[in-house]
């Protein structure tokens, strides 16, 4: 009788374990958006990198949440491996500094929503702020990153213009002009240059209209090497 009771208890325990394991497995699977399965969560490679996905919050130019099933910064593996070297280099230059990621892999459906939100701006001008989803952004291939620099407490460096600022003062190409105007300080430009120095050390490419945006490859290269995220 005792043996039967022990066998029954063990069987019930095993059943509960199997059900719980399946639920956890199912929950983990749901967390990964379709197309993201082979991408890398950059914090699994370097936990000192900070992440604050702006489109998973309302703290963005659209003032509304766009990401509901993306809560980590994902990149293509080869891009992620270069990216963590940038953070290592930054910490070598400034031990108290870290890279802070605002956006990484971005589905084209989200790109379309951003594009549509700026429909009051002519198409030719709009491409200065948001890539046309018809062409695809390098973000849509998980090969671009938006970021800044923060200290080990999470305090961001002053770049003279915020993330997603569409004013000309956010343009790297206009820094000398705004310095002469007294609207950017030398320190703010030095902070931007530090970010560029760190990112370009691993071949990332800054664009002339956004101090925060860096492509790991060109759009042409991304189309050849990677699948677009829809």
For every predicted segment, state its role.
Residues 214:
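Conserved metal-phosphate-binding beta-hairpin within the catalytic cores
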Residues 23-104, 114-209, 217-230:
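Extracytoplasmic cell-surface/polysaccharide-interacting catalytic and binding patches
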Residues 1-29:
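Bacterial Sec-dependent N-terminal signal peptides
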Residues 107:
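Segments that shape or occlude catalytic/ligand-binding pockets
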Residues 110:
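Short, well-ordered surface patches within globular domains
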């Amino acid at each position: 009788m005792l043996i039967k009771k022990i066998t029954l208890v063990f069987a019930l325990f095993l059943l509960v374990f199997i059900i719980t394991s399946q639920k956890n497995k199912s929950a983990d699977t749901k967390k990964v958006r379709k197309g993201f399965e082979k991408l890398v969560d950059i914090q699994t490679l370097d936990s000192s990198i900070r992440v604050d996905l702006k489109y998973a919050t309302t703290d963005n130019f659209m003032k509304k949440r766009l990401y509901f099933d993306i809560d980590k910064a994902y990149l293509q593996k080869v891009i992620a491996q270069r990216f963590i070297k940038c953070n290592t280099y930054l910490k070598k230059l400034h031990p108290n500094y870290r890279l802070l990621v605002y956006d990484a892999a971005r589905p084209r459906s989200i790109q379309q929503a951003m594009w549509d939100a700026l429909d009051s701006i002519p198409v030719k001008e709009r491409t200065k702020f948001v890539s046309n989803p018809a062409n695809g952004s390098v973000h849509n291939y998980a090969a671009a990153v938006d970021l800044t620099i923060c200290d080990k407490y999470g305090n961001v460096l002053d770049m003279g213009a915020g993330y997603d600022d569409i004013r000309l003062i956010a343009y790297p190409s206009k820094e000398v002009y705004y310095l002469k105007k007294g609207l950017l300080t030398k320190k703010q430009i030095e902070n931007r240059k530090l970010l560029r120095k760190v990112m370009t050390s691993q071949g990332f490419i800054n664009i002339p209209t956004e101090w925060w945006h860096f492509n790991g490859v060109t759009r042409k290269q991304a189309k050849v090497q990677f699948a677009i995220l829809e």
